[in-house]
């Protein structure tokens, strides 16, 4: 009986892999790239993590939809895509520019652009965020994409010997004199697209929830405490 059960599991796994491969081929035919097929919390629906963002596909590959998918919990709606991507987000921790809170209560990751007014405003208030127990981690998200000077300047900042100093200087208007091909920045940008980032700053909680744009320190703390309940 145990051997039969194991064999059935193997057949089911093989069928699932075959279905995933078929879905992948179908998406590739529409020029969707770097596809990873995952399960979803909805029966009959698969999650496709792609360079173009998170997509949801029926198991037969006939239907596709894009947009936010929320799990309705007792504490309110939770973005499913963020939960899927949070491990990938944290795998970039060594590439983040981090401003740690001494008495850390919350950690947020901010997709930022050095030309963004509200990013400047957020950066100017870092001490206030830190004093409230909020650690801020930055990832690069040049709003104009990869083929521009800002992306190259941000690459120089993120790969500097002292990235914190380099970013602080850039925020004062002292931009890098030498620029670099945006390799790390490209990874950050693509992750931002997967999260659904459309502008900066975009704030992501430790659970992968995308809060949105700039929030004053006290307002951000309130939002984080509400999502943590």
UniProtKB/Swiss-Prot annotation:
SUPFAM superfamilies: DsbC/DsbG N-terminal domain-like, Thioredoxin-like. GO terms for cellular component: periplasmic space. The keyword Disulfide bond applies. InterPro entries: DiS-bond_Isoase_DsbC/G, DiS-bond_isomerase_DsbC/G_N, DiS-bond_isomerase_DsbC/G_N_sf, Thiol:disulfide_interchange, Thioredoxin-like_fold, Thioredoxin-like_sf. Disulfide bonds join 116-119. Keywords: Disulfide bond, Periplasm, Redox-active center, Signal. CDD domains: DsbA_DsbC_DsbG. It comes from the Bacteria. It holds the Pfam family DsbC_N. It is found in: Periplasm. Residues 1-18 form the signal peptide. Required for disulfide bond formation in some periplasmic proteins. Acts by transferring its disulfide bond to other proteins and is reduced in the process. DsbC is reoxidized by a yet uncharacterized protein. Also acts as a disulfide isomerase. Homodimer. Belongs to the thioredoxin family. DsbC subfamily. This is Thiol:disulfide interchange protein DsbC. The lineage of its organism: Bacteria, Pseudomonadati, Pseudomonadota, Gammaproteobacteria, Pasteurellales.
């Amino acid at each position: 009986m145990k051997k039969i059960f194991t064999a059935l599991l193997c057949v089911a796994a093989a069928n699932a892999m075959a279905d995933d491969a078929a879905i992948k081929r179908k998406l590739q035919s529409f020029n969707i790239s770097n596809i990873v097929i995952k399960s979803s919390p909805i029966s009959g629906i698969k999650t496709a993590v792609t360079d173009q963002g998170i997509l949801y596909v029926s198991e037969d590959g006939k239907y596709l939809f894009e947009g936010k998918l929320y799990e309705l919990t007792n504490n309110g709606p939770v973005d499913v895509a963020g939960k899927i991507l949070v491990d990938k987000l944290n795998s970039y921790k060594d590439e983040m520019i981090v401003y740690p809170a001494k008495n850390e209560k919350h950690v947020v990751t901010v997709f930022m652009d050095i030309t963004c007014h509200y990013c400047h405003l957020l950066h100017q208030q870092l001490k206030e965020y830190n004093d409230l127990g909020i650690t801020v981690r930055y990832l690069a998200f040049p709003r104009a994409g990869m083929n521009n000077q800002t992306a190259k300047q941000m690459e120089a900042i993120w790969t500097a010997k002292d990235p914190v100093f380099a970013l602080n200087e850039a925020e004062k208007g002292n931009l890098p004199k030498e620029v670099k091909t945006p390799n790390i920045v490209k990874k950050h940008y693509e992750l931002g697209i997967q999260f659904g980032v459309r502008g900066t700053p975009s704030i992501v909680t430790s659970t992968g929830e995308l809060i949105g744009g700039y929030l004053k320190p006290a307002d951000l703390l309130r939002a984080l405490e509400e999502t943590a309940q």
